[in-house]
Amino acid sequence: MQAKHFLILLSSAVVLGSCGLIGKKKYDKSEATGWNYNDKNMGGYQVAQTKEQATGPGLVFVQGGTFTMGQTEEDIMGDWNNIPRRVTVPSFYIDRTEVANVHYREYIHWLNRIFDAEADPGNRAIIDAALPDTLVWRSELSYNEPLVEYYFRHPSFNDYPVVGVSWRQAYDYSLWRSDRVNEGILMQKGFVSPQGIQGQQQENNFTTKSYLLGLYQAQPGKGATSKKNPLKTPMGTPRTNVTMEDGLMLPNYRLPFEAEWEYAAYGYINQNPRPSTKEGKRGEELVSNKQVYPWAQNVNGLRETRNGSWHGQFLANFKRGSGDNAGVAGGLNDRAIYTASVKSFYPNGFGIFNMAGNVAEWVADVYRPLTMLDADDVSPYRGNKFMKIYKIESGEAEIDSMGRVKMTEVTDEESASRRNYQRGNVINFLDGDSLSMASYGYGKTTLVSDKSRVFKGGSWNDRAYWLSPGTRRHLEEDQASSMIGFRCAMDRMGSPEGNKRKTGNFFKQRKQKR
């Protein structure tokens, strides 16, 4: 009997003890200090759970690696501006297709809504500065007025690549797209109210940087004010503003660097005989074929070689020869006299369309003939102009007339004591600056300047030579062409192999033998 009473008391004690454990919240601890994360009783330092980077709208993941950048064919132009060199490109994202007319018209629609020219005639300059130059279709001895009038506006051309856009306009579009995507994410997550966008006018509009700095006050959504809001203040109450540390917003869209664009164009992952497809499975460190063109089949030719109804068809939209932009009636070879749909032709190994032909594309880099030799061998890029947030006398940031946070160049005085760079503007570093022997007298001895930007890829009006991703040309950043469009890219945060992958090799730990 006594034993029975003892067992009852013991069971009761266990139950009471477990009830106490159930009500006690477990916290992650800092491996550096031992303090709890996200615990209001221990300082309230908020640390989000590790998150994988989501793939932004329109993008595909490009796993980085090493490749030989530069010419793959004889330099028939005699430019000697694409000397082969091995470089490494970090993983990144790039648009699956070129930016289409319908995408760019969405940008113009937003500008018209926020910067209403009827309410303020001064806003007309903002709209005009963003509009594509449709007059690029004109030629002295060709009838192209239908393209001037309708190519950008008519719904028949919705999914055709936008042209007549300068490098500066493409750069501004990338900034706008970054802000709209992040604003959309916050609305979908319930942290920003959709009703709030109705009151946006002039500089009072959402940009990612102004929101993060608190210069733009968004109207909180239902998710932000809910008790289920996972974001907390140090005191443990729901937090209405999102920070970059929360892992919800994406990095900025931007123009791809030349090395990124060229690497993505080849799609070399398709030339790996056994690529790694999941964590723990090692792939071959091998590229089986050196490609001339982006497509995966017949990598050195221009036609489909596999049997079937498409046997012999062109693999890109380009100009076969003088006076031949499409072939003969009843058997058109590329089925496009001018541009074609941004999703036409085969995608390459990374799933990217039209990296050769259709339209050539702007990349971020400033042009120099010998950039291949001068630039770093990891993430090479020429065009750095280091910036910082502009602050007024009180030390506060401010926004400009477009709602963007004002930025200013890092001065040479600020850079002089640094080991890794000594000037703020290094566009002409080792090629046009005082340290080099090169002299660029723009308009006198050369057409190369610090505003010359690279474009790549060949177009509907180019011969096959320009379809090789290794070829490169340049144009001033404020000029446009009927043969040049663009696509956007985005930095990759996290494992270079993609989501659900680790960074670095993890070996099974073994005890040392004594």
Region locations from a protein language model:
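Short, P/G- and charge-enriched loop/turn segments at secondary-structure junctions
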Residues: 47-49, 79-82, 472-477
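C-terminal motif of bacterial Sec signal peptides marking the signal peptidase cleavage site
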Residues: 17-18
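Sec-dependent N-terminal signal peptides
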Residues: 6-13
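Catalytic loop of the DD-peptidase/beta-lactamase superfamily, centered on the K-T-G motif
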Residues: 471-474, 484, 490-491, 504-506
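Basic K/R-rich, polyanion-interacting modules in nucleoproteins and related proteins
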Residues: 39-50
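A short glycine-rich, aromatic-capped structural motif
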Residues: 51-147, 158-181, 357, 485, ...
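Functional-site microenvironments in short loops/helix caps that host divalent-cation chemistry
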Residues: 25-39, 61-62, 68, 73, ...
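Positively charged n-region of N-terminal signal peptides that target proteins for export
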Residues: 1-5
